[in-house]
Amino acid sequence: MAVPKRKKSKSRRNMHRSHCRLKVPNIGIDKTTGEYKLSHHVCLGGYYNEKQVLEVDSSNV
């Protein structure tokens, strides 16, 4: 079994774990509908960057 030759300091241990955390999703408000949406995603109304890119049935929304 592999064993470390020297003890890893608390600083180096924490730097090693710096990416191991929960990340907050990048949520913004859609300008056309006023609802929350993920950035760089199409909203439920079919809009992306204030332009309609998808035809959405009103019965599904």
Curated annotation (Swiss-Prot):
GO cellular component labels: large ribosomal subunit
Transmembrane segments: none
GO terms for biological process, alphabetical: translation
Record-linked InterPro entries: Ribosomal_bL32, Ribosomal_bL32_bact, Ribosomal_zn-bd
Keywords (A to Z) from UniProt: Ribonucleoprotein, Ribosomal protein
Keyword Ribosomal protein: yes
Recorded GO MF terms: structural constituent of ribosome
Coiled coil location: none
One of the Pfam families matching this protein, by short name: Ribosomal_L32p
Alphabetical list of SUPFAM superfamilies matching this protein: Zn-binding ribosomal proteins
Keyword Ribonucleoprotein attributed: yes
Family: Belongs to the bacterial ribosomal protein bL32 family.
Protein name: Large ribosomal subunit protein bL32
Organism encoding this protein: Ehrlichia chaffeensis (strain ATCC CRL-10679 / Arkansas)
